[in-house]
Regions:
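N-terminal topogenic module of multi-pass integral membrane proteins
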Residues: 1-88, 204-236
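Hydrophobic, aromatic-rich alpha-helical transmembrane segments
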Residues: 3, 40, 44, 48, ...
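C-terminal ends of transmembrane alpha-helices
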Residues: 46, 165-169, 199
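Hydrophobic alpha-helical transmembrane segments in multi-pass integral membrane proteins
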Residues: 63-64, 108-120, 159-175, 222-236
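Membrane-proximal helix-loop-helix units in multi-pass membrane proteins
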Residues: 69-76, 84-164
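Hydrophobic membrane-spanning alpha-helices of multi-pass integral membrane proteins
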Residues: 154-159, 185-193, 217-224
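Short alpha-helical packing/oligomerization segments
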Residues: 167-190
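Transmembrane alpha-helical segments of integral membrane proteins
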Residues: 191-204
Length: 236
């Protein structure tokens, strides 16, 4: 049954999302399937929110990337994730899952900015809303007392990064367009790893100087990547 739900959702995404202008229909059908899957369960909102956000991001990314091979690969990854999500609560509230969610949110938002040229304020609003919702849901699952504060703080950070990185919008593209990764996706994912790891380590009482140096090194790499990999044609 669990794999059936995953295949059903993944099949809808793969068939409809790549078709020009059909992304809204794919999103509506997937939302209906997820609502049916979560119906009658306890905490239906938390059961429904993360799969719908993930599905929406996958639909948008598949609509925006031009190559069928990339779309099929993304659909297969999504099917595996959806099957894993349906297997139970274990692991859902961990840092890797939250990083995957944030990466997909960032990829969808920045590709919309690159391909559809959506207004900057819309991209920032979308990034804030989706980031806040996912972090709040995951942290509430962990029964964090400061879940709202943590979610709002992280949403503010990624919104500010989205504003800044849209000024010099830069995309890493493999020849042929098989892979399109906006620079903002890498920066936000790396920042999420650093902040998330610091928080999780501090909560577990295992934060050390060595770990802090690791995060500092990642931060330096991010700065070098932004400085060296950007065309710097924009203006504040």
């Amino acid at each position: 049954m669990q794999i059936a739900w995953a295949l059903a959702v993944g099949g809808v995404v793969l068939v409809l999302a790549p078709k020009q202008g059909w992304w809204w229909l794919a999103l509506a059908i997937v939302t209906g399937i997820e609502l049916l899957a979560a119906w009658g369960r306890r905490q239906i909102v938390s059961q429904l929110m993360i799969p719908v956000v993930m599905a929406a991001c996958v639909v948008l990314v598949m609509t925006l990337v031009p190559r069928l091979a990339s779309q099929i690969s993304l659909a297969l990854v999504y099917i595996v994730w959806r099957w894993w999500w349906s297997t139970g609560e274990a692991g859902r509230a961990n840092l890797p899952n939250l990083l995957v969610l944030q990466t997909m949110i960032s990829l969808a938002v920045f590709l919309m900015a690159v391909v559809w040229r959506v207004p900057s304020w819309f991209a920032e609003l979308l990034m804030w809303g989706l980031s806040y919702t996912t972090v709040l849901t995951v942290m509430s699952t962990r029964r964090e007392q400061s879940a709202r504060l943590l979610a709002a703080s992280w949403a503010l950070i990624v919104t500010q990064l989205t504003w800044l990185l849209q000024i010099w919008l830069f995309t890493y593209t493999v020849q042929g367009g098989y892979v399109m990764i906006p620079q903002g996706v890498l920066v936000i994912t790396a920042m999420g790893y650093c902040f998330g790891s610091i928080y999780m380590s501090a909560r577990a009482g295992s934060l050390s100087r060595g770990r802090l140096m690791e995060f500092l090194a990642i931060g330096i790499v991010i700065i070098i990547m932004v400085v060296s990999g950007t065309s710097w044609k924009g203006a504040i």
